[in-house]
A protein has these predicted regions:
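Transmembrane alpha-helices and adjacent helix-loop boundaries
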Residues: 1-327
Length: 327
């Protein structure tokens, strides 16, 4: 048994050593455009880890992770917009003047603070996920009904954000590529390399965290919920609490992924809450392998890279491939 443990440990060490070597070599080998794409796809891998946690280990198929992904993106974009608005009239982002707004909305104010922004990026999605999850789980809603409710919530948030032109620029979204951070343009090659490194580190930390969650007693309870929730409830456990916690964790991971994706893509908009995108997130995990964690990471990166390459050669072709993958 000890020998098997040692072999598994060495396999993981070799695996991550190869990944680190690739991550180090990527900025020197890949053009800036391709490096930026890889950084975006790695940020999506963090979202995929959260989905694997709730679906692969707990049996909760959420079709609404785009809500939490977008919230993280909006948090990052709001800070960057404010950080670059010192020369604007009244010190507010330029888009407000298009709608006759001359005073910063109250909920924007805290995002002047970078520490608050970093906390809000994961805490706000986590709290919202906990609230929505608790309302659903305490009524013992599960299976396909849970999936339908998460998609319904996604549509509500999508339509709400689309209509808020005076608050968050509505369908146009918030741009980040022309904003500044640390005295440099966020969209510059230097900053994009920096974001790539940050994303690589956070993917690894997210994997470590989720692996720690599923390898302990907490993870055993999650698997028991997936396999036989009524029996677990009969033994005295409260599945509602565990499902709420794990759904909140997945929401927080989606928020972090959304923030990283936003600073590398240059914009956040309500389209992040579009139904097809949230369904696509599930495909990443399904292709990579439910309950594997590493498979979720590779699934997100490989599927999105394939989408990019196919779309460049045949713009409409990916829709057919995606449909086949979903089936």
């Amino acid at each position: 048994m000890f020998q098997a443990f040692q072999q598994q440990r060495w396999r993981w060490l070799v695996f991550w050593a190869v990944i680190v070597a690739v991550a180090i070599a990527a900025p020197a080998v890949l053009p800036v455009f391709r490096l930026n794409l890889l950084g975006r796809f790695l940020s999506l891998a963090i979202v995929a880890l959260g989905i694997d946690l709730i679906w692969g280990f707990t049996g909760l198929l959420s079709l609404g992770q785009g809500i939490f992904f977008a919230l993280g993106g909006y948090g990052a974009a709001m800070y960057l917009q404010l950080n670059s608005s010192s020369g604007q009239p009244n010190g507010i982002p330029e888009f407000f003047s298009l709608y006759g707004v001359d005073r910063l909305p109250f909920f924007w104010e805290p995002f002047h603070n970078p520490l608050f922004t970093l906390i809000a990026i994961w805490l706000v999605p986590s709290l919202l996920a906990a609230l929505l999850g608790n309302m659903v789980f305490r009524n013992r809603i599960k299976g396909v009904y849970f999936s339908i409710l998460t998609q319904a919530a996604l549509l509500v948030f999508f339509n709400f954000f689309n209509g808020q032109q005076k608050l968050i620029n509505g369908t146009n979204g918030l741009k980040t590529d022309v904003t500044q951070l640390f005295g440099q343009m966020v969209g510059s090659p230097e900053m994009q390399r920096y974001f790539f490194w940050v994303t690589c580190v956070l993917v690894f930390l997210a994997w470590l965290f989720v692996r720690w969650v599923v390898k302990g007693r907490f993870g055993d309870v999650l698997i028991a919920i997936r396999d036989d929730e009524p029996r677990l409830r009969f033994t005295g456990f409260n599945p509602t609490l565990f499902k709420t916690i794990v759904f909140a964790i997945a929401g927080g991971l989606a928020g972090i992924g959304g923030a990283l994706f936003t600073v590398q893509s240059g914009i956040v908009s309500p389209q992040y809450m579009a139904v097809p995108f949230s369904i696509e997130m599930v495909i990443w995990v399904a292709v990579g392998g439910r309950g594997t964690l590493v498979g979720a990471i590779f699934g997100a990166v490989v599927i999105m890279y394939a989408k990019s390459l196919v779309s460049e050669a045949w713009p409409q072709g990916w829709l057919f491939i995606q449909g086949g993958l979903f089936i």
